[in-house]
UniProtKB/Swiss-Prot annotation:
This protein binds to the 23S rRNA, and is important in its secondary structure. It is located near the subunit interface in the base of the L7/L12 stalk, and near the tRNA binding site of the peptidyltransferase center. It comes from Thermotoga petrophila (strain ATCC BAA-488 / DSM 13995 / JCM 10881 / RKU-1). InterPro entries: Ribosomal_uL6-like, Ribosomal_uL6-like_a/b-dom_sf, Ribosomal_uL6_a/b-dom, Ribosomal_uL6_bac-type. This is Large ribosomal subunit protein uL6. Belongs to the universal ribosomal protein uL6 family. Part of the 50S ribosomal subunit. Keywords: Ribonucleoprotein, Ribosomal protein, RNA-binding, rRNA-binding.
Length: 184
């Protein structure tokens, strides 16, 4: 049994979990998330706890246990992330480093000047909220951890930090190791 799945996911006040077929829906104060799971594990709601247990019907060979234990831990983490997302939400902060590098919101897009000959325009997805509190800072927030991380990674990919100068878009708190330049 997965070490994570040995303990239940405790549901906070105001969070409900529905399981129909292999789809888990989590509703909370910030919104609703749903995820489809494979039938390797049984997901059960008991009071205000969610248990992820192995599905004995899926075990044909002894070697299937390893696969089922892997899915059990993964699904436990995914459901836990959904519960945290609908209660607290997720947030990633990016900082833009470089002279003349800046970002601004224009309607449903983020327009970034990143040292290219043209401004970079990124359209904001509907399930994620983006704020620009300062010209050199971008805050990506939402209820789905995977989507928030994906959008932040897409924005960072427009100009990742340069290993020689450190210029570019980086996560707040990210340490960029700089290489030494050429020796003359």
């Amino acid at each position: 049994m997965s070490r994570l799945a040995k303990k239940p996911i405790v549901l906070p006040q105001g969070v409900t979990v529905e399981i129909k077929d292999n789809v888990v829906k989590v509703k909370g104060p910030k919104g609703e998330l749903s995820q489809e799971f494979l039938p390797y594990v049984k997901i059960e709601v008991e009071g205000n706890e969610v248990w992820v247990r192995p599905n004995e019907n899926q075990i044909i060979r002894k070697s299937d246990w390893r696969k089922i234990k892997m899915f059990q831990g993964t699904y436990w983490s995914l459901i836990r992330n959904m519960v945290v997302g609908v209660t607290e939400g997720y947030k990633k902060e990016l900082e833009i480093v470089g002279i003349g590098y800046r970002a601004q919101l224009q309607g449903n897009t983020v327009v970034m000047n990143l040292g290219y000959a043209h401004p970079v325009v990124y359209e904001i997805p509907s399930d994620v909220k983006i704020e620009v509190p300062a010209p050199n800072r971008i805050v990506v927030s939402g209820i789905d951890k995977q989507r928030v991380g994906q959008v932040a990674a897409e924005i960072r990919a427009f100009r990742p930090p340069n290993v020689y100068t450190g210029k570019g878009i980086r996560y707040v708190g990210e340490v960029v190791r700089q290489k030494e330049g050429k020796k003359a």
